[in-house]
Amino acid sequence: MSVSALHNDASKKGAIILCGGKSSRMGRDKATLPFGPELMLQRVVRLLSEEVDSSAIVVVSAMGQILPPLPPEIRVACDENPGRGPLEGLAAGLKAMPDHVEAVYATSCDVPLMATSFVRAMFDHLGEHEIAVPVEGQFHHPLAAVYRPRILTVVQQLLAANKLRPRFLFDEVPTIEVDVESLRVFDPTLSTLMNLNHPEDYEKALEQLENRS
């Protein structure tokens, strides 16, 4: 599918939201943190629903994790091997992805200030590649990247070989690296890349939300 066609056809786009992390630095489950009138995971689901097929949004949770109420079409998968990094969650999400989806945006649940224009731009950058990933110097952002569902087999092979770093995946399949500075036109503060790991990050994000209103 061409870039322009994918841009205009949300039905071919899906999303994976990883929310099974321990949240030890935050001190509580980030998925259920209040953020405005919603909880954190609910907000991220709603924002992504503006850009992708909502029936192709997969929330990847930990075993036994209690999630906030979500729209009935949202899919939930379980990370059966916790503590092995984002590739494990990515594999769980891709396995649960509907067959009609051609590209998937992967994110964590703790990015409530996500800019949907950033997400759209990452889909546009994918082109004929298997992955489009933002890069900041030498650092890749695997949880703000777009993946073709067909890479699942490669992800599973890497996991079986205990190659858990996303960089191994980027080296294995055709990947386009997108300089984060070029994405500021869509997200001037790059808030889509701002994870809330500590209570002070959460408080700062709440202040930013209030300033937007």
Model regions: which residues?
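Nucleotide and nucleotide-moiety/phosphate-recognizing core
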Residues: 6-163, 171-190, 203-212
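N-terminal donor/sugar-recognition subdomains of glycan-related enzymes
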Residues: 3, 198
